[in-house]
């Protein structure tokens, strides 16, 4: 069962679901909570490696994964981020989310932004039960024009679904979970698989 706006408010008030900072009620509508773009970004460098072998996370051409991506860059609220057509950037949400063990979250982009070419997540849009931390967005500009992004702009919406019972292995208790208590923009950790 998906939570409606009234349910979301009740889960937040009971602190079963935690979103920090606590969302203003104007951001909770229908079945979603609007969330904002954070100020931490990671960009891909132009490089000479021809491809990444996803079976072993090696870049053909001798580079490592850390060499193809910038360190985390922190933008001020006034500082724009320019996302060129055909470019991918990793960035974090402004909000931090703590999920209970009996709730799954779903991240969706905003239709108005998608109509301009902005994809909010490449594939990872599920927020697992037991998740705790910022959400990293894999944003892609599929449009023809450069998109200007600014920290704290409304960027996406979260919806929540109640599970039939609490999960046996919540994300925060899994030994192999690669992104526990994520703060900021954590790059791919495929090499830890």
From Swiss-Prot:
One annotated GO molecular function: dCTP deaminase activity
Query: Annotated pathway, please?
Result: Pyrimidine metabolism; dUMP biosynthesis; dUMP from dCTP (dUTP route): step 1/2
The reactions it catalyses are: dCTP + H2O + H(+) = dUTP + NH4(+)
For the keyword Nucleotide-binding, the answer is yes
Binding residue positions for dCTP: 110-115, 128, 136-138, 171, 178, 182
Q: What is its EC number?
A: 3.5.4.13
Catalytic center residues: 138
Disulfide pattern: none
GO BP annotations listed: dUMP biosynthetic process; dUTP biosynthetic process; nucleobase-containing small molecule interconversion
Query: So what does this one do?
Result: Catalyzes the deamination of dCTP to dUTP.
As for family, the record states:
Belongs to the dCTP deaminase family.
| Name this protein carries in UniProt | dCTP deaminase
Recorded source organism is Buchnera aphidicola subsp. Acyrthosiphon pisum (strain APS)
Q: What is the lineage of its organism?
A: Bacteria, Pseudomonadati, Pseudomonadota, Gammaproteobacteria, Enterobacterales
């Amino acid at each position: 069962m998906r939570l409606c706006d009234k349910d979301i408010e009740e889960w937040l008030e009971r602190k079963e679901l935690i979103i920090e900072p606590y969302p203003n009620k104007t951001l909770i509508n229908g079945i979603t909570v609007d969330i904002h773009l954070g100020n931490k970004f990671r960009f891909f460098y132009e490089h000479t490696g021809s491809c990444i072998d996803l079976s072993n996370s090696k870049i053909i051409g001798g580079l490592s994964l850390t060499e193809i991506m910038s360190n985390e860059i922190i933008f001020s609220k006034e500082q724009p981020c320019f996302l060129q057509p055909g470019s991918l950037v990793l960035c974090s949400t402004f909000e931090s989310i703590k999920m209970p063990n009996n709730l799954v979250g779903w991240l969706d982009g905003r239709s108005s932004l998608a109509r301009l070419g902005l994809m909010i997540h490449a594939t990872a849009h599920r927020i697992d039960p037991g998740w705790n931390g910022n959400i990293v967005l894999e944003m892609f500009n599929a449009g023809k024009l450069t998109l200007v992004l600014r920290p704290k702009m409304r960027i996406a919406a979260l919806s929540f679904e109640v599970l039939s019972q609490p999960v046996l292995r919540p994300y925060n208790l899994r030994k192999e979970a690669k992104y526990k208590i994520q703060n900021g923009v954590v790059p791919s950790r495929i090499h830890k698989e």
